[in-house]
Amino acid sequence: GYKPYFAYDPIYTPVYELAREFDLTVAYHTGDTASSTGRLRFAHPLAIDEVAVAYPKLRLVICHFGSPWMADAAEVVAKNPNVYTDLSGLAVGRPETADFRGRFSHYVSELSGWLAFAEKWDRVMFGTDWPLVSLEHYIALIASCVPAAHWEQVFYRSALSAYPKLGKILE
């Protein structure tokens, strides 16, 4: 959304070819933009489906779970085995306050529902966009949206799968 090109625009072909050659992952800012000059149509997660189909061996990440288009992001992740998503930047403020919980209760419910719909916990990753929300409170917020049985996957293992070179660094 910050550049006037869809993810499938040919301008990105060299990036995809290099990423494939060097076994790199391509991450996309999707969803809301932090700038009034950003163009939302270029940040819609459905554009990632086009790239996923054209490059089935390339790992792709839909950052921010495509918010506010979480239903579309969930479908792209569910459909394409090479697509991951992260849960970064989904809330701004102080989740520990009653005001925040009141404002975001519907949002948290919707997020939980679309994550469950996708049922691809092996391709859902924790992310923060810190300092928009304190790390401690954001972890608690995301944990409230993810069944406890999937916490290790979401908070750790999915990132190692999406970014395999990260695992080599951590070993």
Roles of regions detected by a PLM:
Residues 6-125:
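Catalytic pocket-lining loop regions of alpha/beta-barrel enzymes
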Residues 90-92, 130-133:
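Short Gly/Pro-enriched loop/turn and capping motifs at secondary-structure junctions
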Residues 65-68, 130, 154:
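Short beta->alpha linker loops
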